[in-house]
Every structure is written in structure tokens, then in C-alpha cells.
UniProtKB/Swiss-Prot annotation:
Details of cofactor binding: Binds 1 copper ion per subunit.
Protein name: AA9 family lytic polysaccharide monooxygenase E
Compartments it resides in: Secreted
E.C. no: 1.14.99.56
GO biological process assignments: cellulose catabolic process
Domain CBM1: residue ranges: 364-400
Function: Lytic polysaccharide monooxygenase (LPMO) that depolymerizes crystalline and amorphous polysaccharides via the oxidation of scissile alpha- or beta-(1-4)-glycosidic bonds, yielding C1 or C4 oxidation products. Catalysis by LPMOs requires the reduction of the active-site copper from Cu(II) to Cu(I) by a reducing agent and H(2)O(2) or O(2) as a cosubstrate.
Similarity section: Belongs to the polysaccharide monooxygenase AA9 family.
Ligand binding (Cu(2+)): 17, 102, 191
Positions annotated with a glycan in the UniProt record: 75, 154
Pfam families: AA9 (PF03443), CBM_1 (PF00734)
Length: 402
């Protein structure tokens, strides 16, 4: 019984936050790094997502933002493959369920990795910002943020690869920064995710970048901030937005095929459109196009639209190691405000990898990193074994490691 309790506690901790489960490019679905299964496999599938342990909690920045973990997450190692995209393509990143209390900006970067993203030293990558959405609406405390737009869009986010960048191999760094406890130094929580891309096209720009360990400081105004006070503006942390970045009014798209990441180095990137190797999906999803919310007046950064990205359907795939996680995490048909479950021809059994919603577990004990108190909080105040409820501010208490 103790082993079962321990395992349940572990699952609760793992599902307390989020990670990117898959990406979609031009209707083609590519699996991400499935944290609940791939870390335990001797020969996991080749994906474009960088590899991390079975953890999706925040990066530990208690000693500052110079930790290597801030680059691509905890103990991240290079992805074994890449996905080919054309400059100007839009990439949809599908997160698992994101807690609605973890307000903050959503930011995306690119870094040129030279000849081979699978072997590049991550500490040498220099990132330039291609997308950022911070404070959208400050009419009510704590405000509406980029992550709220992500949640509304079925926990997905869409970003466009700038048309002006030169062809080559790049690492896409996509991140949510949760600010619910950012009123004290070291309280902001970073959740970076990385993917290897081979970008084709005819652009010529090679934007200057910033080392991952130099993107932020503990006292940056967008990192050290009390979101429970009235904010008229918010300075999105990190370097300025690349001048060639495009603010897009997004619409959801249908998944028409499944694709597999290409193993190894990308080699020399060609001009023209990307040509992914795909198989037709047995089922696809459609959604009603939506318009991006106006938000540039609130964020002190270059204009950027709120994402209303595409919603993955459950593609039928012959890859045994990934069918369960795909079916449980992306088998939905969604408009911006409506979620409906679809049924595929070969539905998989429920998986422990299905993300748990934030909040209280059935036992009355909250998982690690979940809210356990605060002004007007009505849920349980207990935490799972090994965790304790810590008061971050009058509005928010959180389960943290004891």
C-alpha cells in the first residue's frame, strides 16, 4: 500500500504544472518529450523536444538565473531529432493543463545552433525573442495575462517563425513565467521548453542573441513584481523583441497528418518550403477561427497578439510508445470557448500521463506546487506527503517541498 501511496503522490507532483506535449506545423502533428514514459525507456522515440526528467515543476532559481536549467529546463539534454519548418510557418505548442492561478507572460525565443542542434552546448546558445505576451488586461486584480489566453485556447500557443531570418538550424525556446509568488525575490517560476528546428527560406537576418543564463535577473521589473497590486503596465522580462517578429491574429487549424522528427543533425538548410515526412491521420479536428485580443497597450514590449492556437486532434499512429499519450492528451475538438471530446477508431486506454487539473485531489490534499490557501480560497489547505503549505502572500499559499 505504501508503494501505491508513494506512486500516487509522485503522479500528483508531476501533474502539478505543465509541459509541451506536442507541436503542430501546417497541420502536421509531432510528439513532444513525454515526461511520464520516455525518461524510463532505454530507446525512446526520436523527437524534436529536448529531453528532461519526469518533472514539470519550475526551474530552481533560488541562487539566481545563472543556472543552466533556465535554458531548456531541469537537466535538459539535446533532442535527438528536429522538425523542418519554413520561415513564416506557424507552430502550435500544446501544453498539458496549466493552473489558472499561475498568471504570467508567455515568451518564445530562437537560437542558431550551427550545424547540429543535437550536439550543441546549450550554454553557448544565444536567444533572440520572437514572441511575447504579458499583461493583457489590468481592469481586475491580478489581471489577465498571456497564460490566461493560453488556457482559454485549450492550453495551446501559436508562434510564427520570422520570415526574415536566415535558413539554418535553430533551437526554439518557449516559456511560461508564473508570477503568482513573484512579489518576493526568487518567487517567479520559469517553465522553459526547447525544440530543434531546421528552418528553410530566403531570409538573410542573423539576429544577435543573449545567452540563456543571461536572459533574466532576480530583480528585473518583470520578474520581481506583485501582480496582486494594481498594475497599469508590465515590462516583459528578457531582451527586446526581434524587429522582424510578426504579431499574428491567430486561428485554430486542423490536424491532417502525423509526422516524425528527423533523426540527427539538420545539415545545411535549403531555401523554399518545408517538406515533412508524414502519414495521413485517421481523424482530424476543425475549429472556428478566432481573432487575437488587443493587448499591446498593457505590455511594455513590442506588439504581440494573444495566442488562440490550433487544437490537436487524436491522430492514429502505429508507434506503440506514443499512442496512449496522444490519445489522452490531444483527443479534443475545440473552439475558443467550447471543448468536446472526440472518439477515434482505436481509442487508447487511459494513461497516467493525462494532466491533472490544478486544485485539490480527492483525498483533500493538494499536490506539490498547487494552491493551498490565500484570500477567498475555498479549497483544502493540506498538502501531499513530503510537502507543506507555504504562504507566498496574502492572496496565495502554495504546496512546496517540506
Amino acid at each position: 500500500m505504501s508503494r501505491l501511496v508513494s506512486f500516487a503522490s509522485l503522479l500528483a507532483a508531476v501533474n502539478a504544472h505543465g509541459y509541451v506535449q506536442n507541436i503542430v506545423v501546417n497541420g502536421v502533428y509531432y510528439s513532444g518529450w513525454e515526461i511520464n514514459t520516455y525518461p524510463y525507456m532505454t530507446d525512446p522515440p526520436v523527437v524534436a523536444a529536448w529531453q528532461i526528467p519526469n518533472s514539470n515543476g519550475p526551474v530552481d532559481v533560488s541562487n539566481g538565473y545563472t543556472t543552466e536549467d533556465i535554458i531548456c529546463n531541469l537537466n535538459a539534454t539535446n533532442a535527438a531529432g528536429y522538425v523542418e519548418v519554413a520561415a513564416g510557418d506557424k507552430i502550435n505548442l500544446q501544453w498539458s493543463a496549466w493552473p489558472d492561478t499561475h498568471h504570467g507572460p508567455v515568451i518564445s525565443y530562437l537560437a542558431d545552433c550551427g550545424d547540429d542542434c543535437t550536439t550543441v552546448d546549450k550554454t553557448t546558445l544565444e536567444f533572440f525573442k520572437i514572441d511575447a505576451v504579458g499583461l493583457v488586461d489590468d481592469s481586475t486584480v491580478p489581471g489577465t495575462w498571456g497564460d490566461d489566453e493560453l488556457i482559454e485556447n485549450n492550453n495551446s500557443w501559436m508562434v510564427e517563425i520570422p520570415t526574415s531570418i536566415a535558413p539554418g538550424n535553430y533551437v526554439l525556446r518557449h516559456e511560461i513565467i508564473a508570477l503568482h509568488s513573484a512579489g518576493t525575490e526568487g518567487g517567479a517560476q520559469n517553465y522553459p521548453q526547447c525544440f530543434n528546428l531546421k528552418v528553410t527560406g530566403s531570409g538573410t537576418d542573423s539576429p544577435a542573441g543573449t545567452l540563456g543564463t543571461e536572459l533574466y535577473n532576480l530583480d528585473d521589473p518583470g520578474i520581481l513584481v506583485n501582480i496582486y497590486a494594481s498594475l497599469s503596465t508590465y515590462v516583459i522580462p528578457g531582451p527586446t523583441l526581434y524587429s522582424g517578429a510578426t504579431s499574428i491574429a491567430q486561428a485554430t487549424s486542423a490536424i491532417t497528418a502525423t509526422g516524425s522528427a528527423t533523426s540527427g543533425a539538420g545539415g545545411a538548410a535549403a531555401t523554399g518550403s518545408s517538406a515533412a515526412t508524414t502519414t495521413a491521420a485517421a481523424a482530424s479536428t476543425t475549429a472556428t477561427p478566432t481573432t487575437a485580443a488587443a493587448q499591446t497597450a498593457k505590455s511594455a514590449s513590442a506588439p504581440s497578439s494573444a495566442a488562440t492556437g490550433s487544437v490537436p486532434a487524436a491522430p492514429t499512429t502505429a508507434t506503440v510508445s506514443t499512442t496512449t499519450s496522444i490519445a489522452t492528451s490531444v483527443g479534443t475538438t475545440l473552439t475558443r470557448t467550447t471543448l468536446a471530446t472526440t472518439t477515434t477508431a482505436a481509442a487508447a486506454e487511459p494513461s497516467a500521463s493525462a494532466p491533472a487539473p490544478s486544485g485539490n485531489s480527492a483525498s483533500g490534499s493538494n499536490p506539490l506546487y498547487a494552491q493551498c490557501g490565500g484570500l477567498n480560497f475555498k479549497g483544502a489547505s493540506g498538502c501531499v506527503a513530503g510537502a507543506t503549505c507555504k504562504k507566498m502572500n496574502p492572496y496565495y499559499s502554495q504546496c512546496v517541498s517540506a
